[in-house]
Amino acid sequence: FTQAGPGSVPEVSRPEFCNDCGHCLLVCPVGAIRHRNLEGRAITEVEKDLLPSFRQVQEMVRARRSIRNFLDKPVEREMIEKVVDAARFAPSAKNTQSTRFIAVDNGETLRRIASMTAAWLGRSAKKLRNPLVRAVYLMRGLTTKEEYSRWIGQFELTARNMEKGIDTILYRAPALVLFHADRRVRFAEANANLALQNATFAA
């Protein structure tokens, strides 16, 4: 926005740069801005009284853990929807909102996902033992020798565990939310990781 002088009406100077983030609508102190692409769409106002203090945010960040011990009971659909809703408010580069979500709570489907993933890791470990594949990875700087060896060991162990009925993929979680995006979108992976962090804190 630009303003020619005191008392004059501000004007949008470069509309082609607008990415429809809606921030201008939120920061206007008198709600005077109308956006042609956001008419009729919900703009969520921030309830400042509910915002946590820095100390509370700091403690939440410090307390965050990767939990791999799940209760053997279903997760309510409403709870899953709340977690996904929190995820979708994550920022994204150029407001592309590229992240999409797939929620799975069917036990049989979850077991198939874990089993197929473990099988893929087992096949990958065999490929990684090929000296030519190893040379390409190291030559292109995709990993280090130590990490490469660790990959093989971890992949093979995961595959063996699954054959024994030990799930070290999903750890028999009752629900799963997959974050995905079109790989052609710039920063799609970073956008998905930001959404994942939101979901993690919400969960």
Predicted regions and their residues:
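Acidic, surface-exposed loops and disordered segments
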Residues: 1-203
